[in-house]
From Swiss-Prot:
Subunit composition and interactions: Part of the 50S ribosomal subunit.
Keywords: Ribonucleoprotein, Ribosomal protein
Coiled coil ranges: none
Protein name, UniProt field: Large ribosomal subunit protein uL13
Native organism: Bacillus cytotoxicus (strain DSM 22905 / CIP 110041 / 391-98 / NVH 391-98)
Gene name linked to the record: rplM
Biological processes, Gene Ontology terms: negative regulation of translation; translation
Length: 145
């Protein structure tokens, strides 16, 4: 009788990938990166084990939003003080906080809980074209579509 393969956390081999966000649509980029962080692209994917790879995203400031979302999409946050609801448009986020904009989109697509927090630590986002992870010898990852 055959048994289903279950990966163990100490047996997982992790690769490093570089993804260029220039000209990419935010949601499509985020869903594919979230899939890499989860490890769903591997044949050894196990839902309860972090089998994902490390992802470096460069050129976050050049990500693309479709339609009129640059002006219409609003990001909300709360300061935890009375009357402390703050809001920013997607245009403000892209010009002032491009890293946070991409991280929010990707983290929203990861599992909620301990495993999702562990997966999100393998995400590195940079606004420009430079990154400090050359020592890891990252592979360039070509997005589908």
């Amino acid at each position: 009788m055959r048994t289903t393969f279950m990966a163990k956390a100490n047996e997982v081999e992790r690769k490093w990938y570089v993804v260029d966000a220039e000209g990419q649509t935010l949601g499509r980029l985020a869903s594919e990166v979230a899939s890499i962080l989860r490890g769903k692209h591997k044949p050894t994917f196990t839902p309860h084990v972090d089998t994902g790879d490390h992802v470096i995203i460069i050129n976050a400031e050049k990500v693309h939003l479709t339609g009129n979302k640059l002006n219409d999409k609003i990001y909300y946050r709360h300061t935890q003080h009375p009357g402390g609801l703050k809001q920013r448009t997607a245009l403000e986020m892209r010009t002032n906080y491009p890293v946070q904009m991409l991280e929010l989109a990707i983290k929203g697509m990861l599992p909620k809980g301990r495993l999702g927090r562990q997966m999100s630590k393998k995400l590195n986002v940079y606004a420009g074209a430079e990154h400090p992870h050359q020592a890891q010898k990252p592979e360039v990852y070509e997005l589908r579509g």
